[in-house]
Amino acid sequence: PRVWKSIITAKIGGIDLEVIGDKPNNMPNWLWDFDAKPISEEDKSELKSFEIKSKRGFKGSLYKTDKFTEQHPFGTVPAGFIGNERVGIFESNSILRAVARECKDKSLYGGEDINLTSRIDSFLDANLVFSREFQVYLLELEDITQYTYERTKAAYEFYLEGLEKSLSLSSFIAGDQLTIADISFACEFAQFLREGHY
């Protein structure tokens, strides 16, 4: 669902977007680079120099080229590249912003109104705070503590109360028209609901 943010924005904004990826369980079966590609077990033995062992958020190994990690120093996905220079962009909301800037429909990211753009950014940042709490919850799900449960519950309630307050004053989250703040929320909430079933 996090990559959906950029896909939906590109569709609404009238631009083409190339997305390469796979399901989380298949991530170790790819060589991550600007031109990411699937790899076989045989390939993996030849790509040992690109192997990155699990640190957090996944188990096993992933394979990422030096060029990938230069552009994405945290080594996370989703990961985007933009421009002829193939500049690396990481974090789903940053990729979302980059896509929105390229869209024909500039209103998705506030248009010429820099104050609205800043307001949209505020909601995107609040989104990430909630997402971070939820990710910790998911990673501990098999051995959840009462502390983590209560912290996630409080973050969820705080986040939704803020959105409800905003929506009581306007038709959309950041104002009176659809923006990437709405798209980001819908995708993050879909992730939350989806993961809640497992």
Write out the residue ranges for each language-model feature.
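GST-like domain detector, emphasizing the conserved glutathione-binding G-site
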Residues: 1-153, 158
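Residues at alpha-helix termini
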Residues: 13, 142, 170, 195-196
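Hydrophobic/aromatic-lined pockets within catalytic cores
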Residues: 100-104, 128, 168, 188-189, ...
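Surface-exposed helix-capping loop/turn segments at secondary-structure junctions
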Residues: 105, 165-177
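Solvent-exposed, charged/polar functional surfaces in cytosolic regulatory/catalytic domains
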Residues: 158, 162-166
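GST superfamily/GST-like fold recognition
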Residues: 173-198
